[in-house]
Every structure is written in C-alpha cells, then in structure tokens.
Swiss-Prot record:
Pathway: Cell wall biogenesis; peptidoglycan biosynthesis. Its EC number is 2.4.1.227. This is UDP-N-acetylglucosamine--N-acetylmuramyl-(pentapeptide) pyrophosphoryl-undecaprenol N-acetylglucosamine transferase. One of its GO terms (molecular function) is undecaprenyldiphospho-muramoylpentapeptide beta-N-acetylglucosaminyltransferase activity.
Length: 339
C-alpha cells in the first residue's frame, strides 16, 4: 500500500492530468489517496464524484494576483499561511509516502508543507511556461515532469530533475453516441467568446456536425436551436468525444491540447490572452509548431476566419494517436523512485 497526498486544482487544466496520474498508479499498485481540493472549485466537485474512495480535504485558499505587488495579496498571503498550517496537520495525520502536485496555488501550499515535513515531492507542469508554484517547488522536488521539451528553458537550474513526458490524459472505455463531428470546447468553465463566435458560424456550415461544450445551461439551450449542433453544458468523460471527433475548436489550456495531441485530432486554437504568464498563447504556438493546430488570436477571430480554418483542419485529417499515455511514464518514474 502506497499512501499518496495530491493537489492540483482550481481549474480542469491542473486537475485532469493529476487524476490521470493517480488513476494510472492505482492500476499498478494499491494506493490510498489524500486529495487537497480548492474550496468551491472544480476539483472539489469532480474528485468527490469520480473518486469517493479518496479522502478529499477542501482548503480555503486563493492564488496571488498579478502583478505580485497587488495590494490584495497581503490578505491572500495571510490566508496561504493559515492554509499551510492546516495542510501540515493533515499530512502529519495521514503520513503519505509521497506527494504528487500538478500546479496551481493549492500545489504551492501543499508542496511547501510537504517540504517542511520531509515528504518526497513529484511535480508535473502541463504548460510550456511553468507557473509560479512549479518554479518554486522544482527546487524541492525529486522529479519534475514536463509536457514539452521547451519547458527546460524556464527551469535551467533543475535540469537533472526534469523528465519530458508529455501531458497525462484520462482514459475512458466510453464512446460518444455520435461520430465525425467537430468538437467545440471553451475550457472547464466554458467560453463566452467562443460561444458567441460559433453562434454565427453554425448557420453557415449546416452540412457539418458539431458537438459544443457550452459551460452554461443558457448557452446549451440557445445553441441547441441549430440542427447541426449537439450542445452540452459539460462533457464527461472528455475522451469519449475526442475519440470520435475529426477536428476541434478550443482554448489552449494544457489539458485540452494534451487530449488533442493524444487522440490525434487537429485543432483550431483560440488562446485566452489573459491567462497567467501567457500560458495559453505559448501552449497554442507550440502545438502549432508541432503540427497539431492553427492558432487564431482572439482579437483576430471572426466567423469567416473560423469557417476557412475548419475547412483546413478537416482536410488535414486525423493525426496518428499517441502510442502511450504520458501518465504511464510518469507512474513508472514515481514507482522507480519510491519502491
């Protein structure tokens, strides 16, 4: 039995790769998991639903605002300190053999608490440009797993710890009830901009079938009016739909790009320009460089440009699916270090 403490939440981009790692580890060895979730965020809801066997602890913490000298960060820093004390109490009680972290502010809290208690730390960075938590925790980690080779350039001091693995993807046996459609995603919370844009595109492409994850019941009702659109408020499991998609339109969050690359689906990427450290833009440009997508800046996105790009990616056809899920390599590395 291996006891694992884990954190990586606030958004689906941090959460789903972490669940992929934990689920893969659980297939190989007996595990007991203590999961630290951000109170009121997606990880709290999804983990309790998908993994009731995990012990899930909700922590009331928020990340630091940018720029870092923002006046509200004084209060947030105090809350981070209080949260770290709370996390330490749980870690002392649970006595984990290791900690697995995938970024986000909750990872910073759990990672620093684990460091103080001498618990081995393993970190995964999904984005091309590492976030603040991963930059800080890399110095204490036994291994730093990264999705892209280029990420090494941002963690030069810790080259001996870095393992390029790709970004883990959750597996599923389920399959969507449709096939040969363009998958439209706005991220785990939906995207108003993508929803509004596609509402103008759908009447022009009535021969093309779309599945659109809207992020809200109102948008689901609104977009369901188009006969060529299957509108869903939330898609779960995502893999069931990626398997059957012929192309995609999405933001450029790390887990979305990971699924796109894993299932070999060419995509149109509209990065969210306000993402921290320009994560999404850098992710999108790297995916485009590797031949997986077309990048359209949000301020340049128009119905006509989307229609032209859909034609290009559909004609490109599906790319060969990855032979191995990065979660497998990460699991092997972790088990090799602790067993």
């Amino acid at each position: 039995m291996i006891k694992i403490a884990a954190a990586g939440g606030g958004t689906g981009g941090h959460l789903y790769p972490l669940l992929a790692i934990l689920e893969t580890l659980a297939k190989r060895v007996d595990v007991k998991v203590l999961f630290f979730a951000v109170k009121g965020k997606i990880d709290e809801r999804v983990v309790r639903k998908d993994h009731p066997e995990f012990e899930t602890v909700s922590i009331d913490v928020r990340g630091l605002l940018r720029p870092l000298h923002h006046p509200k960060n004084l209060w947030r820093t105090l809350k981070i300190g209080i949260a770290t004390i709370e996390v330490k109490k749980h870690l002392k009680r649970f006595k984990p053999d290791l900690v697995v972290l995938t970024g986000g502010y909750i990872s910073g809290v759990v990672g620093l608490a684990a460091k103080d208690l001498g618990i081995p730390i393993f970190v995964h960075e999904q984005n091309v440009v590492p976030g603040l938590a991963v930059k800080v925790l890399s110095q204490y980690a036994k291994k730093v797993f990264v999705s892209f080779e280029r990420t090494r350039n941002y963690l030069r001091e810790w080259q001996d710890k870095i393992v390029v693995t790709g970004c883990p993807v959750r597996e599923t046996e389920k399959e969507a009830p449709l096939k040969d459609f363009v998958l439209v995603l706005g991220g785990s919370l939906g995207s108003e901009a993508i929803n509004e844009l596609m509402e103008k595109v759908y009447p022009e492409l009535q021969e093309t079938q779309f599945v659109h994850s809207t992020g809200s019941d109102d948008w689901t009702k609104r977009l369901s009016a188009f006969p060529n659109v299957t509108a869903l408020t939330y898609i779960d499991p995502m893999g069931a739909y990626w398997k059957k998609a012929i192309a995609s339109i999405s933001r450029a969050g790390a887990s979305t790009i990971a699924e796109m690359m894993y299932y070999g689906v060419p995509g149109i990427l509209i990065p969210w320009e306000s993402s921290a450290e320009s994560h999404q833009l850098e992710n999108a440009l790297e995916a485009e460089r590797l031949g997986y997508g077309i990048v359209i800046r949000e301020n340049e996105a128009s119905p006509r440009k989307i229609i032209e790009s859909i034609d290009k990616v559909v004609k490109k056809g599906k790319i060969e699916k990855m032979k191995e899920n990065p979660a497998s390599k990460i699991s092997e590395e972790i088990l090799g270090e602790i067993m």
